[in-house]
């Protein structure tokens, strides 16, 4: 309260690290803690998550994302997804698509897997052709764009705090919508 105009935004945070204290802080801060969380998903398929050595399962992530959305109405919820990780099957990809459809994401960052020399992932069997990884990425990006469009439309006309960028009259709302400010 000593510096009333300071606002904070939580960057990328694992679903397993989000607790009730953080959600309460977002809920009760009057916009000082942005209603926005970026929860890396990587995949919506348990076999892929295990190969990635992720800490969460599909169901644990799903449960937490729904709890977050229920606890903080109008939260901007984002995620990262990697398509074409070694061993990812079409069924795994469709599990990811279904999870993205179900969860209240407002944006996604979708990347195709790219092998890096010297990494464990580069040595895994069953590489996915880059063409397939690219197609899967395009499908998820199209879904993400539609979800983002619907979320923006649902917020249209609502007043919102905007943090202006250094140059010009562009900024971000607390829930991570890019806006142009008139004036």
Task: Show where each model-derived region lies.
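Short, small-residue-rich loop/turn micro-motifs
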Residues: 40-45, 112-117, 175
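Conserved, mostly hydrophobic/aromatic
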Residues: 10, 39, 80, 100, ...
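Conserved SAM/AdoMet-binding glycine-rich loop
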Residues: 1-90
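C-terminal, non-catalytic macromolecule-binding modules
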Residues: 71, 90-91, 95-137
